[in-house]
Amino acid sequence: MKKERGLALAACAALAALMLLFASQCSPLYPINLWDDANCLLTVGRVMRRGGVLYRDIYEQKGPLLYLIHALAACVSDTSFWGVYALEIPALTAALYAAYRLLRLRTGAGFALGAAAVWGALTVTSGSFMRGDSAEEFCLPLLTAALALAYAEYGRRARPMRAKRLLLCGVLAGGIATIKYTLLGAMVGLCAVEGALALKEGGAPRALKSAGVFLAGMAIPILPWVIYFAANGALRDAYTAYIYNNVFLYGGEAASWGQRLGEMARYVQKNALWAIPAALGLAALAADRGETAAVRLCVAAMAAGQFAAVFFVGRVWAYSLLGLAAFGVIGCMQLHRALKKIGCPRGKKALTAAACAASLLLAWFATPNAFLRGQKIEQIAQGRLAAAMPEGATLLQYSHLDDGLYLAAHTLPREKYFVLLNVQLEAMRDALDRAVREAVPDYVLVSWRVLPAEFDRYELAASDVGYDDDNRLNKTLYLYRRKSE
């Protein structure tokens, strides 16, 4: 068994490295990751690498573990996304291996590895994967592992989870909480089922024991951050930026139910190759009398909780559905059950190899990022604009998110508010206005629209056209230079 698992883990690592090499814009095959969200993450990580304290010295809105990952990535490469690619590999490896272990509960080793590979390829080529490097991507292994643990426990007995497994689930939940806490819906569903089983077995004392074990696990990845921020006098900054502002100030106008349903249909369509199998698999599992009632209830509760978290907590973005991708593995499990009814095919090793090879071909040909693969940084807007800036010049992205010029120009923001985030925060807008009005940075970058005329201490130095989120060359970038006094 250990040898089998070791070989499976090695295969998952190789598959992850190649899939991401082909499909993620963080890989060495791409000149830069064009996604503004990913650039924000890496810019913050680069600032942290140089000693900046998150939330206190530089403002962003996601969880601290995500920025630590990017600080480590900046240690690998401070001038490219190669470090992010290096850290994407263990994340996807863990997700593939968790999927393998989940499938292995009900299938043979060959099918489990082949199905995990195909699931991984469908995930990294889906619309929700975007250009690579999202909070959802780094939460995927944690969510898939939690699903595998829950299935392993409740699939063998309708009793509360054993303490060590429950503690580990708590650790996974704590990891998610320190990356993006709005992705905790699946863990809420797991806790609801665990609480019900504990109450049934031993009443309130048993339920409190389960709650204590789970919360103790959550505290393991959370407490070090509390200590870190307290030691740096940034505890209030962390609470305000990550909790308060995201709850009360994030996003724009509330979407109507019609708008939400429209978004749901559109995003499901862009992720149909794993979303439809996930939905069919969940429906088949709910009706599968060969599984325990506890596991059917738990998986349904986890899926419902995550679905609610993705679609009804805050705004829905193109990448949001990646938080549901773990449930695509349930579709693979139910496919195996259906295949067993008509007889298992022979040549399992050959089929496994074929599935793995097909997954790599899929990652190469089906990724929507292929348009950028093989280009050089000098061929795209970020590289050309960076060439217009002298070495050592300071920069501020005045409007929109980070378009990648901080990275391409090998510079870092000097201001706490370095981009315009989707947070209705007056202090951020005022700080950006003040920096440009007082001509603090040498250069100012704006996207889509020209710099307002009131900021007359800058002159246009260069403009270029970059790619928008639909991979079209229609996003105009304007680079302004401070006028000589």
Describe the predicted segments one by one.
Residues K2, Y97, Q269-R296, A300-Q306:
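Hydrophobic, aromatic-rich transmembrane alpha-helices
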